[in-house]
Amino acid sequence: MTDNRSGALNVQGLGHVVLKVRDLKRSVPFYRDVLGLKEVGHFGDRMVFFSVVDNHHDIALLQTREDAAAAPVDAPGLAHVALKIGDSLEELRQARAWLEANGVAISRVRDHIVSRSIYFPDPDGNELEVFVDNEEKVWLEDPELVATSKELAL
């Protein structure tokens, strides 16, 4: 379907993200037990599907070769996947404590004004972000704020 005004597609939402991993047996417990995603299906021994909310799946992990090289940091491609965990700074503090207690190396903690975030790699180096939204819709008044990023002390 297209949007009748411009001929462009009428995108109605983001369906899912598929991440390549070297070892499903290592990655599945991370996404299920550390991140708390609901494991909802498998495609043989090559893919595992997870749901964040009530969708059939939001994230899938695709097994690649165990010796596959990671993409260079400056290569085109997906930079990170962001998962909303709440709306309060206290929820973000609790998330940081949980991640650290589970051996996750935090790479950075940022205040984006519109949201506050913790970034960290999954077992294969895919960068993930957990975030809480700012209660105020400040970006409606100043769209430049969407691109703001400064260090956040938690």
Where are these regions (language model features)?
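A short local loop/turn or secondary-structure capping micro-motif enriched for an aromatic residue
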Residues: D58, D67-A70, E135-W139
